[in-house]
Amino acid sequence: MQLTSSVDLGYPVFERTILPNGLRVVTEQIPSVRSISVGVWIGAGSRDESPEEAGLAHFIEHMVFKGTTRRRGHHIAQRMEAVGGYLNAFTSKEYTCYYARALDEHLERALDVVLDLALDPTFPEKEIEKEQDVVLEEIKMYADAPEDLIFDQYEATIYPDHPLGWPVLGTPETVRSFTRADLRQFVETRYTPNRLVVSVAGNVEHDAVVALVRKLTAGFDRPPVPVERAPVNGYAPKHVVSSKPIQQAHLVVGTRAWGLEDERRTTVSILNTILGGGMSSRLSQNIREKYGYCYSVYSFANMLADAGDFGVYIGVDAGKVDRARHLVERELHKLATRRVSDRMLNRAKTQLKGSMMLGLESMSNRMMRMGKVELAFERYFTLDDVIAHVDGVTADEVRDVAAALFETERLSSIAIVPESA
């Protein structure tokens, strides 16, 4: 039995259908554009790996482009580029996405290509070793980029001995160990209908999308596999310092926070905007502009299904690391102990809402928003829903969330400093 629901408040029109096999189709119809963005989302990422599988979800994302039953590798990209379209993919901690952009007249082509990639890869043996070399070079590239490497070290500190603390790319040892059987086993047990979402935004009609998905997934009958994920374990703050042959020091100060299931998620977003959201933020004004200590400083909030973290990054001269840490912690302390002014709160709300609404000018952003929200909540939030949540946050709630997050004894710090420091 097929289940369909819709939210029609004028355009865009959101509709959602659950196919009999459990695969979900979500669309936003926007007739005023000529483009479409199509995504196939799999609710499986690096979090769903065993220690021996670390990096496997990402490696599969690479390998599907090497060929499917119906297409050789070079034909896959050519299929979209021939009509001026675009094809790509990415892997995160909790999901993998294969997506395409094209004109609305090429909807079937785009759906066909991304579903073919996700559901029918062949994983040619001769390509596996070559792609292992490619991914190993990708790992080296990140290892040579301290502003990226420090976040791997940060996540390992925030989520110790847990898949969320492992790098999405895996390690050279795990990547080199992957076999074709490993890839097929992961796909058979994670790329199942109950974990799949097809998300489409643009000048499309929902019923037409559903009909195409049904046609293109005929015979896709892998049995559903329950989503079982290890709960996050305990967190104990740590202070880690390492050195590399670099000229600038890199510092992250952060802590464990809450996941998307927590009602404080909107307050966290506003707090993040006040603290590190752009050149007018407190971090930028009170550290970069006031002291000239850095070029790059910002805050970040990572929110996963049932876990999250919040932190600050700063790139600074090696001789000023301790002073920079003190200045960052001072800003955190002020937010935790003092109520922000109504003017600052309203400015942050306006900034956050404006950023979200401008992002919705892009069909790709709309498609990605639907896919992520469906995987996380199995429902749809209208823009009015989101704005109401933002407008409902109070200054007291911002202070209370900051106080819960920024207790000094909860903060971890990770630094990568020059070897000569």
Segments from the language model and where they lie:
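Active/ligand-binding-proximal structured segments within catalytic/core domains
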Residues: 22, 29-82, 154, 191, ...
